[in-house]
UniProtKB/Swiss-Prot annotation:
The keyword Repeat applies. The lineage of its organism: Eukaryota, Viridiplantae, Streptophyta, Embryophyta, Tracheophyta. Kelch repeats lie at residues 100-150, 249-301. This is F-box/kelch-repeat protein At2g24250. Residues 14-63 form the F-box domain. Gene3D superfamilies: 1.20.1280.50. It comes from the Eukaryota.
Amino acid sequence: MAMKKKISTSSIMPDWSQLPEELLHIISTHLEDHYFDAVHARSVCRSWRSTFPFPSSLLRQSYSLPAFPLESKDLCCTLEKVPLFLFRVLTPPDAADASSEYFLGGLGQDKSNDHVELPSPLQCSVKVNVPGTEPILMNMLDCQIIPLGHKYRLMIGCNPEEYSAAFLPLNEQGGGGEFVALLDCTDLFLVLRSTEMRWIRLEKPSTASCKELFTFRGRFYATFFNGDTFVIDPSSLEATPLTPHIDSNFLVPSGNEELFLVKTDFLRCRVSRLDEEAAEWVEVSDLGDRVLFLGGHLGNFYCSAKELPHGCGLTGDSILFTVGSRNVTYPYKYGVHTNKRKAEDNINCWRSSRENRVLFRNRYDPVLSFRVER
C-alpha cells in the first residue's frame, strides 16, 4: 500500500510577510477609515503590525489639565476620551440557540499586570471584564462591532474619579485644538477653557444632583434628578432652562442630527424631538432605524438598526431600558395593544412589545452585558 505524503501546514498557508511593500501601502490607505479592519490586518503576522499603525480612534485620547482644585495639587489631572462600542457575538445561521449575545462598553488597551502579547490571530482579541466572572477573551473576528460614540472620564493621578464630565471642541474646522471642559463636582460645576487653562467655579443652576452631562450642537446640556434640564453656553456660561420639567425623563442625542426626550413611567413612553428654532419639543411616533439605549452607568446612547442583520433580536424604532431592578425586560415599540378594553387602550405611545425577551447578565461598570432571545 502506498503511503500518503504528509503535507506540511506551513506549505499550505501563505507567507503574508513576503507581500510587497507597495501593495501593503495600498492596503493601508483603504483601512484609514475602517479601524477594526486595520486591527484585523495587524493580527495577520508580526511584520504587518509595524506596517499598519494601531488606529488612533481606538486609543483613549487624553488631555492634560491643570491641577484639580478639589484634590491634592501634587497629583496630575487628565481628561480621558473613552470610545464606546456595541459588540454582537456572531452565531451560525443554523444554530439551535436563536439568542444573540451583546456587550456594550468602552474599549482600551490592556495594561494589566498579567497582560501578554498573543500570537496571531488571537492578537485581534478583546478581553471582556464582567464583574463576578472570569475575564473572557473574545476574538474580534467573531463579532460585529458598532461604534456608539464616546464618553469622558476624569483621571486624578492614576485613578478615575466619579465626576461627570463633558468636553466640547471649539472651531474644529479652523483647527487650533481649543476646547471647553465641564465637570460636575457634586456641589458645583467646574469649567476649564483651553485658552486660559485654569478652573473656574460655576454655580449649579439646580438644587438637585446632576444626572448627566453631554454636548449637542456646540452647547452643554445638564440634566438633574428633580427633572431640571439646562442648556449651558460654552462662551458666556449662561444656563438656560429647558422645558418641560419632568421627573422621569431621558435625553438622547442622535449625533448632531436630533435630540430626543423620552418621558416615561416605565409602563409607557412618549418621545419628542427638540425643535431648536421654535425652542419647543415636538412629539414623534417614529424613531426611524434608531435603537435607543436608556439609563445605566454609560448614560443614554443610540445605534442604527441598519447595521444590524435581520433576526438578531434588535430592530429599529425601538427603545431598550438598561436600568432597573429586574434582569428581564423587552424592547419598547410604538402602538402596542394591551389587554384592556378598546376604549381604555391608548396605543399612541411606546410600550413593552413582548416580542424578544432581553436578559441582562450585567448592568454595572465597566461593561453592559445582555442576551436577546427570539
